[in-house]
Amino acid sequence: MGSEMCIRDRETLPQSFPRFVFTAENRERIRFLAGEPDRWRNTRDRALRHLNNPDHYFDVEYLAQYELKTETLSHFRYRFVEQMADARARLKLELPEGNTDHLKGHPGFMPWSINEHYLKLVSSFSYLQVFKTMGTPEEITNAQANVVYRMGILSHFVVDAAQPLHTTEHFNGWTGENPKGYTTSRRFHSWVDGGFFRSTTDPNRAAITKQLNPAALLMRPASRDLASGQFQAIIDYILKQHRLVEPLYQLDKTGKLSKETPDAGREFVQKQLAAGSQMIGDLWFNAWKEAPPDRFLQRYLAQRKLKEE
């Protein structure tokens, strides 16, 4: 759906949110950075593709072959890899053929990617608040620039997750058994991502904004023993979009995602843009609210001040 549309996420933030984010320069910077992770695809180097590509999707259906459920997934990326490796050995699963990037049959890392980028934003807010009281003007400016960077990168993956095709093995046309006759076009993903609006008219930003609520604190699991960041809220968000995969294909099959009869398709995609905007705003807000002062940096800057006196 195009991260660089960049959405209406700032509409959800309170007036007390750091104001430097709202300058024209930083608004444009965030919009530009929202497309940055896709620009990392401009190389054909397999090592970078292997690293970057799985962060953009989470094909929920692939969990079944590993006998894994979303309720039991580790919040930690590499522990999740171990869960899959254990299942592959136990179930004697063979590696897919033609697997040049070593990614076929892999569900992807999108929930972990979003959560990790969220936590990096928490970190950026943590040291920004210390620099604001104890740092130099140059340090404050640099810390603010890092917050803007983290906000932009995080927003990309959240918008990816709002596009239902980023949550399914049917990410670019229906695959496998297809009794309902859904499209198998390899252009379907790009059509939903932006081709649909380019062929009709731009999204109605006012209609998107009407669907937004003020950013709010996200619910935490009852037990925090295994909790990490906002992983559970992110999984819930992704699963909600995954439930819309077949309705999206149904819209296409009935011609309602076409330039000739676009109204229902427009409503659907704008609703997803609103969902992405809401989640981005919520995660930005939570990162700011939850960021503790960077105690290590406080001690370092206090020692620096003593040496200067």
Residue ranges and their predicted role:
Residues 1:
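Sequence/structural segment immediately N-terminal to covalent heme-attachment motifs in c-type
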Residues 4-149, 153, 164-274, 278-309:
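N-terminal, motif-rich segments that launch catalysis or mediate targeting to/interaction with membranes
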